[in-house]
Design a protein with these regions (language model features):
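Interfacial aromatic "cap" segments that immediately flank transmembrane helices
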Residues: 23-54, 92-123, 160-175, 182-234, ...
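Residue-level recognition of pore/gate-forming positions within transmembrane alpha-helices
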Residues: 51-52, 56, 70, 74-75, ...
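Membrane-interface interhelical loops and short interface/amphipathic helices
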Residues: 135-159
């Protein structure tokens, strides 16, 4: 079974400017991710289980658990990208690749990336709350709180407010989805660019966003497929994520290889 060869010219000297690729590659990356998964399914599933256990333990640390979870996620993601890169070079994938982001000079830039990502998440939450408050107004928020607390509230009086609130929340939801997509565009390739190209964190976020924007068709097609796969993977008690989790990693690596590799490599290798 053939996996994408390692793109020539990749290394710690920095990533080239991203290429424009066909929109259809957004689907092809998922096909390539399956080949990456079946090349070492045991190691991939082991990484998912270990990551889930570590994330759960971090979450239950008082006060700082959630922060640590968000900050360390790019560190683990960097290790996974190194694992994908090892497979592309014909090397053996192990669960230990999950922790390679903690080694050498990789940890500091990945932690910086994690703190930036945490700031983005906090900013998104603040923006969502602010939009809700502005859309409804202080009196509207108070009225909705009263409705939740008082079963005898005047529903006739509150009906127009509830209707306007529904429209406002729909608009807010659309804005939030747009902002989340923009954030995802900046983060998509960032861990790979840090560990595989030696990009500084801010530069990695910029190049990832630029790559996504230049290839918005592929990015949107990729995202739509991801949503469908995520729904299916979540149905059997979330067990499908044992496969989809590694496929997400593999698809990110495939996207990095085609967009930041040499133009001649802009298509996945046949399986």
């Amino acid at each position: 079974m053939e996996i994408m060869p390692t793109p020539s010219g990749s290394g710690p000297s920095g990533a080239p400017e991203p290429h424009r690729v066909e929109a259809g590659l957004g689907a092809a990356w998922w096909g390539e991710s399956w080949r990456i998964f079946v090349a070492a399914p045991g190691a991939w599933i082991g990484m998912v289980v270990v990551f889930a256990v570590v994330s759960t333990l971090l979450f239950f640390i008082p006060a700082v658990g959630g922060i640590l979870q968000s900050v360390l996620t790019p560190v683990f993601a960097g290790g996974v990208m190194l694992g994908c890169h090892a497979l592309a070079r014909g090397e053996r994938l192990t669960v230990g690749h999950l922790f390679e982001g903690f080694q050498g000079g990789r940890l500091a830039p990945l932690l910086v990336l994690g703190f930036i990502w945490l700031a983005i998440l906090v900013g998104l939450a603040i923006v969502a709350v602010a939009f809700a408050y502005v859309a409804l107004g202080a009196s509207g928020v108070s009225a909705l709180m009263a409705l939740g607390a008082d079963a005898q509230a005047d529903y006739v009086t509150l009906t127009p407010l509830l209707l306007s609130a529904g429209v406002a929340f729909l608009v807010i939801a659309m804005i939030c989805v747009t902002v989340v997509l923009l954030a995802a565009m900046a983060y998509w390739f960032a861990p790979a660019l840090v560990v595989l190209n030696g990009e500084p964190p801010v530069s990695a976020l910029r190049k990832s966003f630029d790559a996504s924007l230049r290839n918005i068709g592929a990015f949107l097609l990729y995202s739509v497929i991801y949503i469908g796969l995520a729904i299916v993977a979540s149905i059997p008690a979330g067990l499908g994520w044992l496969v989809l989790g590694p496929m997400v990693a593999g698809s990110c690596y495939a996207g990095w290889r085609t967009i930041f590799g040499p133009p001649a490599d802009s298509r996945p290798a046949p399986g």
